[in-house]
């Protein structure tokens, strides 16, 4: 049985919505808690819509002990040794295809039941931030006609890999210009995060400098916790949001 869809929706208030993509070994319910400070700060502007990854997994980095007993936990990509069937190892393309289904269902269910609150942006963490980047890149390559036009994205502590980079480069037919995603983004990087170098590399490889605002905070693989970092995160998002609104990118 698929997990129930989780949203933060207030009836009677037509707004815009943000698609939320959790990390590996996590869940929509846990991610809702992880970004609670951001949700509270943006509650007058946005609804939050949560997608759930397709594969069961053990708890991911930073999930325990805080979220002990809050399973089941899910991951977006199966490991090679878990996904082998008849000695056939799935390609990156196969694994990207596997994440599309649950995201598409989340988007379409929301669009049908809440047409007054279109999805216009993304909030994604860790492996979910990689999923978001892959989806944005696929859309920019003329694929995913069902995927909403994203005007803004917040990517938190992205887990990035050479394998993902090589896949996107192959999709772009080695045209570096086609590797660049033209969406205004806020990137949150923990200075003590094990994934910091990959997060930086993803920004350099896939996002326009003039559209990518990078905030490095004192922390590990988590959403910012210190009040000053939370305030700066909200301030940067609101500045980016106002810039996007002024450009007329929101419908």
From Swiss-Prot:
InterPro entries xrefs: AB_hydrolase_fold, FSH-like_dom, LovG
Pathway this chain belongs to: Polyketide biosynthesis
A molecular function GO annotation: hydrolase activity
GO BP term, example: monocarboxylic acid biosynthetic process
Gene Ontology cellular-component terms listed: cytoplasm; nucleus
Function: Esterase; part of the gene cluster that mediates the biosynthesis of compactin, also known as mevastatin or ML-236B, and which acts as a potent competitive inhibitor of HMG-CoA reductase. Compactin biosynthesis is performed in two stages. The first stage is catalyzed by the nonaketide synthase mlcA, which belongs to type I polyketide synthases and catalyzes the iterative nine-step formation of the polyketide.
Listed name of the protein: Esterase mlcF
